């Protein structure tokens, strides 16, 4: 054993001593604050670490119960949400563009051809009334044994297209196809009266011819009055009434024959 100790001493020639561990510390003996031996550090205040301000605050006490915790937010009931959304929605008839007040005013305007019409109301695209009047006209023809629904709708479409082209050429402001169809459809109301008389008596006599001519003049006068008031076509009523009379004359021929 003594030989082995001598061998280690001879082999490791160094000035390092075990007693210098607490003083040197692996080559850091020249620093201002050398490492301290184990057990001499103050662990209450760690060096180089500072906690975030929010992490060191005390926790808020839990105020809820075990089976009834305190909710983080109060959800809005579905009933109140749906009721508020339904109140904000417009009525269904308004979304469909059906206004019974305007329909009644347009009907009265047609029934009073000598009365001044409101151009702002007549300039609206309302097809609910014209569709009802077309169905009523076809129904009265059906009562006389004439199934003419196809002719009624076909002639109406062709007549609306022709009047649309003509009015756009004559007026300075222009007009939409829906407005033309609406006015011509409302002015079909006197023709329903003519076909209703055809259910009671024949329209092929002298009285029938006079009544038919009066109804054609009524329809064309109402339509031309509405067109010139809605499109500001002063002094052109006769020019507008002539093609309207041709259109309603075709409907009168269907009613008579």
From Swiss-Prot:
Q: Which residues lie on this side of the membrane: Cytoplasmic?
A: 1-124, 168-173, 218-236
Gene that codes for this? yipf5
Q: Which UniProt keywords apply?
A: Endoplasmic reticulum, ER-Golgi transport, Golgi apparatus, Membrane, Protein transport, Transmembrane, Transmembrane helix, Transport
Species whose genome carries this gene: Danio rerio (Zebrafish)
Intervals, Lumenal compartment:
146, 195-196
Q: What does this protein do?
A: Plays a role in transport between endoplasmic reticulum and Golgi.
GO biological process terms held by the UniProt record: endoplasmic reticulum to Golgi vesicle-mediated transport; protein transport; regulation of ER to Golgi vesicle-mediated transport; vesicle fusion with Golgi apparatus
Query: So where does this one cross the membrane?
Result: 125-145, 147-167, 174-194, 197-217, 237-257
What is the protein's major site of localization? Answer: endoplasmic reticulum
Q: How does it sit in the membrane?
A: Multi-pass membrane protein
Family membership: Belongs to the YIP1 family.
Q: Transport as a keyword?
A: yes
Q: Tell me where it resides.
A: Endoplasmic reticulum membrane; Golgi apparatus, cis-Golgi network membrane
Top-rank taxon: Eukaryota
**Pfam families xref list:** Yip1
Q: Which GO terms describe its cellular component?
A: endoplasmic reticulum membrane; trans-Golgi network
Task: From the Swiss-Prot or TrEMBL record, give the protein name.
Answer: Protein YIPF5
């Amino acid at each position: 054993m003594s030989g082995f100790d001598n061998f280690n001493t001879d082999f490791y020639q160094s000035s390092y001593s075990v007693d210098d561990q607490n003083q040197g510390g692996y080559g850091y003996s020249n620093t201002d604050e050398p490492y301290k031996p184990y057990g001499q550090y103050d662990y209450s205040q760690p060096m180089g670490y500072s906690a975030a301000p929010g992490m060191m605050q005390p926790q808020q006490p839990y105020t809820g119960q075990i089976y009834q915790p305190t909710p983080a937010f109060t959800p809005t009931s579905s009933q109140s949400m749906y009721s508020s959304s339904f109140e904000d929605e417009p009525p269904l008839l308004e979304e469909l563009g059906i206004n019974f007040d305007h329909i009644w005013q347009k009907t009265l305007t047609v029934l009073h051809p000598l009365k001044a019409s409101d151009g702002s109301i007549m300039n609206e695209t309302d097809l609910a009334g014209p569709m009802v009047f077309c169905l009523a006209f076809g129904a009265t023809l059906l009562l006389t044994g004439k199934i003419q629904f196809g002719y009624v709708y076909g002639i109406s479409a062709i007549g609306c297209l022709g009047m649309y082209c003509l009015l756009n050429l004559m007026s300075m402001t222009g007009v939409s196809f829906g407005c033309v169809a609406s006015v011509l459809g409302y002015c079909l109301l006197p023709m329903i009266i003519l076909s209703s008389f055809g259910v009671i008596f024949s329209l092929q006599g002298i009285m029938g011819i006079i009544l038919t001519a009066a109804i054609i003049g009524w329809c064309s006068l109402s339509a031309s009055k509405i067109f010139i008031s809605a499109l500001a076509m002063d002094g052109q009523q006769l020019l507008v009434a002539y093609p309207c009379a041709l259109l309603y004359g075709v409907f009168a021929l269907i009613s008579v024959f």
